[in-house]
């Protein structure tokens, strides 16, 4: 017998069944949370919070107070294996009571659920002989500047303003099947700056993907050798300064001895005593100056030695990692100017990455501009952009030669310049339009950040405890990945006819803000499930039908880790 239910969140129905298939619901339910249980478990409330994020809810209260409240939609609750949903206040209390260990345990579930997708995409890339393409960035999550209820919020640069809030460090990855996918997010105070986070971004990407390139230990060995050699002038200066100090102290001692001897002789003229006293004071000042010089050199040498120790420690670590990584992958990282310090550039080079970055030091732009003459041939690379480049340029403070380009472009009537840097085997200086396009393709992460804020509303923090804020960040990037995985899954399992809603042809924004918030009728019996969009919906006349029996899949992508959607439903004709 057919069962029918109405829903105002149509796309959340198949998304719920997809969540069952990949083990998301059972994974969250298995996390131990130290909260009292009344009618609903805290795990169910955490799951409801995720569904709210997935549906593009702007404010937590919209769960109960929106035009079509999520907590009244029993069809969605059943699709997500819940008897019903709870009021938003209960969700808020459950999220507030989460501690850091519990939030991280839930985040680990999301990582575990995601792992088969990463493994599959990495296998595809290996089969195609392609490397990994990463993009990293730091994005601000501002709150009201007058707020005092957000723990550990701090003032920092956010969207060209100084705002109170937090920073989220994110890494995205280009997937051959799904396009942009998020790899990681790390929660930081609002005063965190990009230049301190480059290494953390790379390590987070490597931890999440389980892959890293071959470390360039030969370059690091050469760097250490040159680094030690660069200390030789300072060592010589230190020795000469020690000798100068000793000579000054000896001269002072001799002068004071002469002064004492002269004072014991009654016949000594006052002028002689005055001369010796002045000479002693001069030596005293000379000793003070010599000590300051020696101390300054000693501090520099100590810092230099400590840096050498750090480099040697890095070398040992990288050599060990190369031994433990018999099948390294090739990988590329793109970063904006905030990360482009010489130390960060050197580190990423030594870690084995091909690197595309803008330089952090604005002085290099002025130096490059001085190298340009009226006869310099500029290459047109974009609508309003031109570039000139120098291969393997050795910058003063960078241990490795870089491909350097000076870019000039217009914003309105104002001409601006920036410096791009590249390290890797790609001969970028022979094709500047390709270099320009490759670097600016990092706009994909900027588009991804925009999506998290304008589709999933990450910029509207729905909770005020820091562990819960972190979990909202994690759930938001997971939701962005989840909808992409689910779109392919729906296309593989839905019956295709002229009335089928083309979910795969819809953008993510339309899927979330429209399809996940529109009305439909859910009809099911032994044949399968039919999601028929209502006549009042923008998708009137469209439907999604899933058969209960297995169909030959259109792709084998999910076969290693999915079972077929086991639904009970009826197709209306």
Where are these regions (language model features)?
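N-terminal basic/disordered segments at the start of proteins
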Residues: 1-20
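Anion-binding and metal-coordination hotspots
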Residues: 1-7, 25-573
């Amino acid at each position: 017998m057919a069962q029918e239910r109405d829903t105002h969140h149509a796309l959340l129905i198949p998304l719920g069944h997809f969540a069952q298939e990949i083990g998301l619901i059972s994974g969250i339910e298995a996390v131990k949370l130290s909260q009292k249980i009344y009618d609903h478990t805290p795990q169910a409330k955490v799951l409801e919070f995720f569904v709210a994020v997935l549906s593009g809810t702007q404010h937590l209260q919209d769960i109960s107070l929106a035009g079509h409240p999520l907590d009244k939609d029993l069809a969605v609750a059943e699709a997500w294996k819940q008897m019903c949903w709870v009021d938003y206040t209960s969700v808020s209390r459950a999220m507030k009571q989460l501690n850091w260990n519990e939030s991280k345990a839930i985040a680990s579930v999301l990582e575990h659920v995601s792992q088969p997708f990463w493994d599959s995409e990495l296998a595809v890339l290996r089969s195609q002989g392609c490397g990994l393409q990463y993009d990293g960035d730091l994005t601000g999550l501002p709150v009201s500047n007058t707020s005092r209820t957000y723990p550990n919020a701090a003032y920092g640069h956010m969207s060209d303003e100084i705002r109170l809030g937090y920073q989220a460090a994110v890494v995205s990855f280009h997937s051959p099947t799904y396009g942009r996918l998020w790899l990681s997010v790390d929660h930081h105070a609002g005063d965190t700056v990009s230049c301190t986070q480059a290494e953390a971004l790379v390590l987070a990407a490597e931890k999440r993907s389980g892959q890293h390139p071959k470390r360039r230990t030969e370059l690091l060995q050469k760097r250490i050798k040159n680094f030690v050699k660069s200390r030789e002038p300072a060592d010589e200066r230190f020795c000469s300064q020690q000798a100068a100090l000793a000579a000054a102290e000896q001269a002072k001692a001799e002068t004071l001895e002469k002064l004492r001897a002269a004072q014991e002789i009654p016949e000594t003229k006052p002028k002689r005593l005055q001369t010796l006293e002045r000479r002693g004071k001069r030596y005293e000042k000379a000793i003070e100056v010599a000590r300051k010089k020696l101390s300054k050199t000693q501090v520099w040498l100590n810092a230099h030695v400590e840096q050498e120790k750090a480099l040697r420690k890095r070398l040992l670590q990288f050599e060990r990692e190369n031994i433990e990584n018999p099948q390294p992958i090739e990988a590329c990282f793109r970063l904006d100017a905030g990360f482009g310090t010489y130390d960060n550039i050197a580190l990423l080079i030594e870690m084995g990455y091909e690197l595309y970055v803008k330089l952090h030091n604005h002085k290099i732009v002025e130096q490059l501009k001085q190298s340009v003459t009226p006869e310099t041939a500029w290459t047109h690379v974009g609508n309003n952009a031109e570039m000139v480049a120098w291969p393997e340029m050795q910058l003063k403070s960078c241990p490795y030669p870089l491909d350097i380009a000076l870019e000039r472009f217009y914003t309105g009537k104002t001409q601006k310049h920036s410096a791009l840097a590249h390290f890797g085997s790609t001969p970028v200086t022979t094709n500047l339009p390709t270099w320009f396009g490759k670097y600016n393709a990092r706009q994909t992460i900027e588009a991804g950040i925009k999506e998290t804020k304008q589709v999933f509303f990450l910029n509207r923090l729905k909770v005020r405890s820091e562990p819960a804020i972190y979990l909202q960040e994690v759930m938001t990037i997971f939701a962005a990945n989840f909808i992409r995985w689910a779109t392919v899954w729906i296309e593989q399992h839905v019956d295709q006819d002229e009335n089928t809603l083309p979910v795969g042809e819809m953008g993510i924004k339309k899927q979330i803000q429209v399809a996940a918030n529109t009305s439909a009728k859910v009809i099911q019996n032994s044949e399968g499930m039919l999601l028929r969009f209502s006549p009042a919906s923008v998708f009137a006349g469209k439907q999604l039908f899933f058969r209960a029996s297995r169909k030959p899949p259109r792709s084998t992508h999910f076969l290693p880790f999915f079972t077929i959607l086991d639904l009970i439903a009826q197709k209306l004709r």
